[in-house]
């Protein structure tokens, strides 16, 4: 609460007749029938002025709340001149809208920040009484991690309109299941499309010719599904006696050119038999 004696008289109108922030803000709130106002703690003194203006205009006073400042990991405040710390730039980097809303809504509150993929869930979770009076500490690393975990929750319907630029055989639920656990930002699907489309020379990875010949020989007929991988690798194992890393690593390198990555059982259905044979260097 404020004692009016401790407040100076606010300037409402400049000498040239133009209006300052206070009066237009209150009138706008009245016209728009605003019932709740949440703003930074640097506006607490302004709130005292605005309540007096609401009273003077004989209007209902909204419910006011003030959230604490955002500070960096060293405990320093952010300047408005730090352009990189803006919603616009976060979105340019690839952060999902719901990630940003989730993080900044619950940072500095007693509520745990956990990945959420649905706006209704966020609304139901939010309770303004959980917001701390202490400054909220921003961590870019935590925000990045939250975005990665949020993408894991997305089903294909939630992202399909965002990947229509990919080749037709990658605009599938199987592709999304293949990459979703291995990306931090959605735009990384573009890199995985290139990885999967590339035909790698298995000789660059010192893979034995006989192994590749057997892999091609026992490759099941298409169409492929998520069970094809197990059937194929089981057949290769029976022919070669290889198992574990000795069995799976050569196939991963041939198919993706990378020593690690998503589950390959989701990769196989993205191709027909000729596509896999091409990667094996047999076409």
Question: Language-model segments: which ranges?
Answer:
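C-terminal accessory/binding modules appended to enzymatic or scaffolding proteins
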Residues: 207-255
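Short, charged/polar micro-motifs that form catalytic or ligand-binding hotspots
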Residues: 40, 90, 237, 241
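Active-site cores that bind ATP or allylic diphosphates and position pyrophosphate for catalysis
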Residues: 1-66, 72-78, 86
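Hydrophobic residues within well-ordered alpha-helices
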Residues: 50, 143, 179, 214-215, ...
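Catalytic adenosine-cofactor/nucleotide-binding cores of aminoacyl-tRNA synthetases and other
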Residues: 57-201, 256-283
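Generic non-transmembrane alpha-helix signal with a bias for helix starts/N-cap capping motifs
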Residues: 47, 83, 97, 229-230
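Short amphipathic alpha-helical face segments that pack within enzyme cores
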Residues: 45-52, 99, 246, 250
């Amino acid at each position: 609460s404020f004692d009016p004696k401790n407040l100076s008289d606010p300037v409402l109108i400049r000498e040239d007749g133009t209006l300052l922030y206070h009066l237009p803000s209150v009138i706008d709130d009245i016209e728009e029938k605003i019932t709740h106002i949440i703003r930074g703690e640097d506006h607490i003194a302004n709130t005292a002025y605005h309540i007096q203006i609401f009273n003077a205009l004989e209007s209902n006073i909204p419910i006011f709340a003030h959230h604490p400042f955002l500070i960096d990991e060293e405990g320093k405040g952010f300047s408005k001149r730090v352009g990189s710390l803006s919603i616009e730039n976060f979105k340019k980097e690839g952060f999902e809208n719901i990630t940003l809303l989730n993080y900044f809504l619950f940072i500095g509150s007693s509520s745990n920040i956990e990945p959420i993929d649905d706006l209704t869930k966020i609304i139901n979770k939010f309770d303004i009484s959980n917001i701390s009076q202490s400054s909220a500490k921003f961590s870019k690393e935590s925000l990045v991690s939250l975005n990665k975990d949020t993408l894991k929750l997305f089903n294909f319907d939630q992202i399909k309109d965002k990947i229509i630029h990919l080749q037709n055989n990658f605009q599938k639920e199987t592709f999304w299941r293949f990459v979703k656990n291995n990306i931090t930002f959605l735009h990384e699907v573009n890199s995985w499309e290139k990885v999967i489309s590339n035909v790698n020379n298995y000789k660059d990875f010192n893979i034995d010719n006989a192994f590749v010949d057997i892999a091609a020989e026992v490759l099941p007929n298409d169409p492929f599904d998520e069970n094809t991988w197990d059937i194929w690798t089981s057949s290769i194992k029976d022919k070669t006696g290889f198992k574990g890393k000795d069995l799976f690593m050569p196939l991963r390198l041939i198919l993706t050119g990378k020593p690690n990555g998503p589950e390959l059982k989701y990769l196989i259905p993205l191709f027909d038999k000729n596509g896999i044979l091409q990667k094996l260097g047999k076409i």
